[in-house]
Amino acid sequence: MVKTQRVVITPGEPAGIGPDLVVQLAQREWPVELVVCADATLLTDRAAMLGLPLTLRPYSPNSPAQPQTAGILTLLPVALRESVTAGQLAVENGHYVVETLARACDGCLNGEFAALITGPVHKGVINDAGIPFTGHTEFFEERSRAKKVVMMLATEELRVALATTHLPLRDIADAITPALLHEVIAILHHDLRTKFGIAEPRILVCGLNPHAGEGGHMGTEEIGTIIPVLDELRAQGMKLSGPLPADTLFQPKYLDNADAVLAMYHDQGLPVLKYQGFGRGVNITLGLPFIRTSVDHGTALELAGRGEADVGSFITALNLAIKMIVNTQ
């Protein structure tokens, strides 16, 4: 790494395990400076509950970034709206969560931070607070004014990107258009090159229907939409295989010769990845003008403050972000 960079972290839902995980992250040394966008008392209280040492130092944007020292976190303060009891949601703190996301996103956009790592949020409590919120991905897409973003989940062995994300099954076929596929594949290909350092990405593309349509007998989206798009992009030099049946694609025969899989919808690609690497997966938002990774699990309210939360996914998300920073320098 040419120089020390700052990585901003949002712990997510304050009543969940996000603050616990951030405190656990702070127990290690890191080659970047970790800047946590959160309430100071929340972090110190949670550290005390876990019996872990934690010192907070104020964020100073005009001073050089310093590598992370164990037991110390740099704090970018955002105040809670209500006091927090571990495991108990408070509706007003939905506003707090969104404020942390907005400040962290803006800091990435203006160059303060080299990457953003997000902890798990509780979408229900944010919406109950009167804030329309579908998820991190859509929030950052809108706030950064990105033209289009792509959700990708990854473990060390497998990367799965999604052509569509949070859509009902009945709407997915209509959403799979030539324009969408062109856009999604272009973003996936570009970010695999620029953020993952893969010179010539090899992408496996799932079909939409069982058996990838069985030659048109089980659906025509492959023949009418997916195959023509793949042919066009192959003619431009992209290394694309498919459309392949999703029930046979996820095996070494195909995966050993690929850098990523493009699934047509959420529950086509992610069950395999989460089974293969649950607790080690990372959510990456492609197409943003900055690096964003996230844990692949929820708030686990029942574990908050108990010292039982697994920090593995957060560590993987941070390590991946650091690698992506290096690749973009």
From Swiss-Prot:
Q: Which reaction does it catalyse?
A: 4-(phosphooxy)-L-threonine + NAD(+) = 3-amino-2-oxopropyl phosphate + CO2 + NADH
Which Gene3D superfamilies does its entry note?
Answer: Isopropylmalate Dehydrogenase
Query: Which pathway, metabolic or otherwise, does it act in?
Result: Cofactor biosynthesis; pyridoxine 5'-phosphate biosynthesis; pyridoxine 5'-phosphate from D-erythrose 4-phosphate: step 4/5
Q: Which cofactor does it need?
A: Zn(2+); Mg(2+); Co(2+)
Q: Which GO terms describe its biological process?
A: pyridoxal phosphate biosynthetic process; pyridoxine biosynthetic process
The GO terms describing molecular function are:
4-hydroxythreonine-4-phosphate dehydrogenase activity; cobalt ion binding; magnesium ion binding; NAD binding; zinc ion binding
Localization (cell): Cytoplasm
Q: Does the keyword Metal-binding apply?
A: yes
Give the residues the record marks as binding a divalent metal cation: 166, 211, 266
Q: Which Pfam families match?
A: PdxA
Which key words are in the record?
Cobalt, Cytoplasm, Magnesium, Metal-binding, NAD, NADP, Oxidoreductase, Pyridoxine biosynthesis, Zinc
Q: Which residues bind substrate?
A: 136-137, 274, 283, 292
Example of a GO cellular component annotation carried by this entry: cytoplasm
Q: Summarize subunit and interaction data from the UniProt record for this chain.
A: Homodimer.
Q: What else is known?
A: The active site is located at the dimer interface.
Primary role: Catalyzes the NAD(P)-dependent oxidation of 4-(phosphooxy)-L-threonine (HTP) into 2-amino-3-oxo-4-(phosphooxy)butyric acid which spontaneously decarboxylates to form 3-amino-2-oxopropyl phosphate (AHAP).
Task: Report the family membership.
Answer: Belongs to the PdxA family.
Q: Which NCBIfam families match?
A: pdxA
- Protein name, please? 4-hydroxythreonine-4-phosphate dehydrogenase
